[in-house]
Structures are given as C-alpha cells and as structure tokens.
C-alpha cells in the first residue's frame, strides 16, 4: 500500500496548478456570473491529478468494512446483505430518469410500483395504509408521532402531550418525541428485560398521547404482554406506536397491526435490504390502522380503475407535511425488489431464520460470555462482557480484538441496562459455517483474555489504524480540513 496516499487527506496531496480534468469547448458564448454572486476568493479545493485521486480513494475504500466484506453482527442494525438485483433495478433508466413533476400519464408504471409497495407493506404489517414519503427511519418516526399529535388535535384533546418510552428504547424514540414537541416519560423494565406493566399502569392518564414500543425490544426479547399493554393504553385514550427497528424477526411470525398497534414506521435499510449509512438516502415508511389514514402526509398514490393517480390533499385541517414529492423513490424501489424476489413463501422464513441464528450464537457462547437474561431471544441478544471479570478485559477490548480477525464489532455499551453490553445480531443471511467461525473467534478471544490479556487490551494490531483515542475525539472533534489546517 502507498502510505502517502492512504495516510493523508486529499487536501494534503494537493499541488498548486495540478489538474485532473479538462473542460469542453465553450459553445454557448460568454456569460459572466453577476458580480454580487461571485466568490471574493478562490474556493479551497484540492488540486490533484486523476491518478492520485483514484489511488487515494481506492485505498480508502479497501480499508473500509461492509457486509460484502464479511460478517457484520452489529446489534440493533440488521446488517443484512443487499442483493445486487436491487441496484440493477434501481439503475434502470425507466426509473432513474423519472422526474417528480412529469405528467401522470407518462409514469403509470412508476406510480404502480409506488402503490403496490404501499399495499405490500400493509399486508406484511397488518396496518391499513402507508405513506412512503419520509426520507429516513428517524424521519419516519417523527412523522408517525406527528400523525398521533394531529389525531389528538383533531379531537380537541390538546392536553395529550406525553409519550411513554421504555428504558431500553432506541435513542431516537425520546429524540423524535422531543422534536415533535412532546414530553418523554420513561417506563421501567422488569428483571426479565421487558416492560413493567405495573409501572406502566401508574403512568397512564388523560395526558398520554402514545406509548412507543419496539417488539422484540432492544434486548432481543419478545414483549409477551402486548395484548394487556395495548388494552390499558387504548382504555386511557392513548395510541400504540410500533418502532419498526426490530421488524425483521417478526416477518412470517406476527404483524404489529394484529397486536393492537395504531401507528408504526419501518426502516427499509434494516428489514428490506436497502443500503445503510453514508448519510442517506434512506426511507422510513409510516403505516396506520383504519381510521387514521386521513392524518398521513400527502402526496400519495391511489388506484382508480386501471389507472394510478397522484393525490395531493387529504382534505384535513390537521394534515401532516414532511417533504415534497414521493420520498426517496429509488430506495423504495430497492426494497420492493427485495420483497418481490423473496415472495410470500420466502419472506415468511426471514424472521424464523434470523431468530435461529441469534439463538445459535447465544447458546454456543454463554459459558464464556455473561448472559444477563438467560432466555430464548429473537433476532439479537446482549452479553454483559466476559464471564471472567478478573482479567480486566472489557467489552471494548473484545470488540477491538474482533477487528484483528476480520469481523466488524457488535454494538457495544448499548442498551444502557448493562455496564459491559455487547449486542449481537447475525441476520438471516448468514450460514452455519460463518456462525461457527465467529463463535470460534469469540471463544479464542475469551481464552486470550486469560493467557495474554495485554494482547487483547491493546488491539487492534492488524488494521491500518490502531486503537483511536475516543475520549480525545469526543472532546476535540476535528471534522473538517479547515479545522486541521488552522
């Protein structure tokens, strides 16, 4: 590897006057940018030749890690394989060249895909209607809460401003509620890791707008008392919100709508194999039960006879608006391709296989890693670090050492219920051979913690970047080249 190209920022490879491009001949005449719109000084951009740029970014990409590189057991993230067919379909010019303002008659096929995706999600979740407008999972979560707020406002029930979330909830739950102008109230978990119904009962009154739940929850445990919980919430006039972050193990097993949830969002990048990360694009469809459809944002697509039309109003004073046009259409298209590829028969296998894989790893390692809640899990589970605490090897050390063996680390120190949390989620894609290899490596690290703890505590040793100073990075974040150059 050329360390000069890898170890420096692209700005540090810049040489004045060096060019990697050429401009075409000007065939449109000379048109100056108005003086008031011109820069006062040159843009601070790197000047590099094409080969340097290609080598630099190729080296960077080779030192990244993704699902296509290897096993990625990042708990609560559902890092499943994104089939290439998804990308091929999304790249078809019939879809890629669409414009959101073109006439309905010229994009009937695209509108049909949008409509069919709405119906597919309804069938999978048991909810009446979906909007595909939200641009990310957290955006969908916010949209769902806005729907709930609009519902209560339409009834003149303005004092319902509280949202109850479990202490094991995803961080986006309280964050979305706060952004929506709602007050967050925390409900405790039992020693078994599920919602404490007695504690919840004491929190319910006529100020509660909704209860947000993830099922299975963040510990990978199924909330068995949902029937009782939803009855209590509905009796007090609140709504049930389903955080679709952990929908994957539910596929083929049960549906949120059938359990009594009123509103939910789905993370397409988790359950339906669209790309993770990179800052977007994302998609967070929101579904509602019958009776709440009028509060969903527009535009939406409806079918009239054999034609599809765009509906831009729902005729409500309390409508929700979250973005222009149809959300991230290409992301939705990838997810719909995944659904069609699996079909009804195989999509029913997703949940059971994800659950089987998680329990297989858990049972194989519980003698060397502490299992705080020893019960059957769903798609993921949480260890509380090594069973033998005398070595001084932490969850962070184990995670760093895993990098040396070519695995991405699991989610660590979340949920906050355990001091040395290590959350592992294998997804349904992984073979038994992959799981066995991963188990063997974690057992080897547990043995290293006893025989050579310093090797583990100073890991990683085989990666291009060694152990970084997390505390310094948090205290003195340098996020741009300008900060570094100053």
Question: For each predicted feature, which ranges?
Answer:
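General small-molecule cofactor/ligand-binding pocket signal
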Residues: 131, 185-187, 410
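Short strand-loop junctions, especially beta-strand C-caps/beta-turns
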Residues: 135, 190, 214-216, 384-386, ...
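Non-catalytic terminal extensions of PLP-dependent enzymes
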Residues: 1-129, 254, 304-326, 332, ...
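Single, functionally critical "micro-switch" positions that shape active/binding sites
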Residues: 74, 136, 242
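Conserved PLP-enzyme active-site core in the AAT-like
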Residues: 109, 139-306, 392-393, 420
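Hydrophobic alpha-helical membrane segments of integral membrane proteins
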Residues: 133, 273-274, 350-351
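A short, small-residue-rich loop immediately preceding and capping a beta-strand
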Residues: 128-134, 162-165
